[in-house]
Amino acid sequence: MVYLKNFLELGISETFNHTLRENGITEATPIQEKAIPVILSGKDIIGQAKTGTGKTLAFVLPILEKIDPECSDVQALIVAPTRELALQITTEIKKMLVQREDINVLAIYGGQDVAQQLRKLKGNTHIVVATPGRLLDHIRRETIDLSNLSTIVLDEADQMLYFGFLYDIEDILDETPGSKQTMLFSATMPKDIKKLAKRYMDEPQMIQVQSEEVTVDTIEQRVIETTDRAKPDALRFVMDRDQPFLAVIFCRTKVRASKLYDNLKGLGYNCAELHGDIPQAKRERVMKSFREAKIQYLIATDVAARGLDVDGVTHVFNYDIPEDVESYIHRIGRTGRAGGSGLAITFVAAKDEKHLEEIEKTLGAPIQREIIEQPKIKRVDENGKPVPKPAPKKSGQNRQRDSREGSRSDSRRDSRNSSRSDSRNSSRNSSRNENNRSFNKPSNKKGSTKQGQQRRGR
C-alpha cells in the first residue's frame, strides 16, 4: 500500500515528526491522512476504521499538538473499553512525548490503587486515558475535574456498546463541557452508536477507511482441518514444527483458554494466559513479559486481546475459529504489524465450516488448506524427559493360554488331592505325623502356592 502524504504536510510539527522518524514512521496511513487535518481544524469526527489501520496516532498526534502545557487542567480525555487498550494508547502517547516532557498523561482503570490515582489527578495532568467504569467513579467522587476539557475521544465505541457501557458513556458525556471537540472511532456502526453520535456530536464529519484499504497482504493465512478431539495435538504439532518467535493463541472462552494453558504449561511450553479472570496486576505483568519476549506463547480471548499491539509477533493461531469476520481480521492483525510479515493459522472442525465460509466470502478468496495426518506427539514429564509407554495388555491368545494352563493345573491338583486322600485311607495305622511331614504339609504348601499363582495369572 502506498501512502501519499507525510506528517509535516498534514500539519504535525517537526518535534513530533522527529519522534515519528525515530520510531520508523515516515508516512501516514489512510485514516491518519484523512483524520488529522479535520481534527486539527477542531471539528467533531466519526472515524470508521478497523484495528491495525493506525487510528490511534490519527487522534493522538493532533491532540498533542493542541495541548497547552502551561494549563494544568485535564484538556483531553480518551475513553477505551478495556484496560489493555487504555494502557496501549497511553504507551503510544508516551512514545510521542520523548521530546515533550512538559505534557503529562495518566491512565486510570479498575484494579489500580485509588489513592495513587487521586494523588496523580491532583497533579499536573493534561491527558487522561480511562476505562468507563473507573472514570465514572472518579466523576461521582468529584476527584477529577473536566470543566476545562477541550477534547474527548471514544475509542472502539462498538466494543464499549458490546460490554454494556452505553449508559456509562452517556453519563460521562453529560459531565463534559458542551463546547468540547468530540471524536468517535468504531470498526462498525450499530444503531445505538449512531444515536449516541446524533445526540452528543455537533455536525460530525464522517471519515471511513474502506475494507480494501485494510490489507492483510503481508499475512499468510492457512486453515488446518481437524476435529475438536485432535485439535490439541494438531496445535502442538504446528508449534513444534514452526517454532514461532512470538505467537498469540486465540480461544473462544475463558474456560477454554485456561484449559489449553494448563495443557501446554504442563508439557513444558513457555506460555501464559490472558483473559478476564486473570487479576489486573498479573495481566500487566504478562503483557510486559510478552512484549519483552520472555513469554513465547500468549493464550488469549478476544476481549482480553483488544488493543494488543506487540512487535515481533510472527504467528497467530486461531485455536477456536472466531464467529464473525471482524474478530478474524482483528485476530490475524496481531501479526504482520508495521508492514512486517506474519502467519495466521486457523483450526477448523466440521461444525466451523459456516464461519469459515463467511470469512472467505468477505476476504474474496479461499484460504489455503493444510492437512495434518495423525501428528506424533512426544509425552514428557515435568522435567521434559520422555514418559515410557505403558506395558501393553495381554492379547486374547495369552488369556486363552493362561486359561488352559489354569485348567490343567486344577486337573492335576484334583488328581493329586484324590491320590492323597486314598493314601490316607489305606495307611491309617501308619504314623500320621510322619505322613503329614512327608506328604500332606508339602502338598498343602505347594497347592496353596499354585492357587496364588493361578489367581495372579488370571
UniProtKB/Swiss-Prot annotation:
Q: Give the residue interval(s) assigned to the motif DEAD box.
A: 155-158
Annotated region Disordered: the residues are: 374-458
Q: Where, in this chain's numbering, is ATP bound?
A: 49-56
Q: Where is the composition biased (Low complexity)?
A: 426-438
The UniProt induction remark is: Induced at 10 degrees Celsius.
Looking up InterPro entries in the UniProt record yields:
DEAD/DEAH_box_helicase_dom, DEAD_box_RNA_helicases, Helicase_ATP-bd, Helicase_C-like, P-loop_NTPase, RNA_helicase_DEAD_Q_motif
**Where does the source fall among the domains of life?**
Bacteria
Molecular-function GO terms, alphabetical = ATP binding; ATP hydrolysis activity; RNA helicase activity; RNA strand annealing activity
PROSITE patterns to which the protein is assigned, alphabetical? HELICASE_ATP_BIND_1, HELICASE_CTER, Q_MOTIF
Start and end residues of each Helicase C-terminal domain: 218-379
Q: Which GO terms describe its cellular component?
A: cytosol
Q: Its Gene Ontology biological processes? A: response to cold
Indicate, by first and last residue, each region the UniProt record lists as having compositional bias (Basic residues). 443-458
Q: Which reaction does it catalyse?
A: ATP + H2O = ADP + phosphate + H(+)
**Keywords for this protein:** ATP-binding, Helicase, Hydrolase, Nucleotide-binding
Q: Which residues form the Helicase ATP-binding domain?
A: 36-207
Q: Where is this motif: Q motif?
A: 5-33
| Matches recorded under CDD domains | DEADc (cd00268), SF2_C_DEAD (cd18787)
Instruction: Give its E.C. classification number.
Output: 3.6.4.13
Point to the regions of Basic and acidic residues compositional bias: 374-384, 399-425
Tell me the null mutant phenotype: Wild-type growth rate at 10 and 30 degrees Celsius, no change upon exposure to H(2)O(2) or diamide.
Any Pfam family from its record, for instance, is Helicase_C
What does the UniProt function comment say about this protein? DEAD-box RNA helicase. Probably has an RNA-dependent ATPase activity and a 3' to 5' RNA helicase activity that uses the energy of ATP hydrolysis to destabilize and unwind short RNA duplexes.
Q: What is this protein called?
A: DEAD-box ATP-dependent RNA helicase CshE
Q: Which organism is it from?
A: Bacillus cereus (strain ATCC 14579 / DSM 31 / CCUG 7414 / JCM 2152 / NBRC 15305 / NCIMB 9373 / NCTC 2599 / NRRL B-3711)
**Lineage in the entry?**
Bacteria, Bacillati, Bacillota, Bacilli, Bacillales
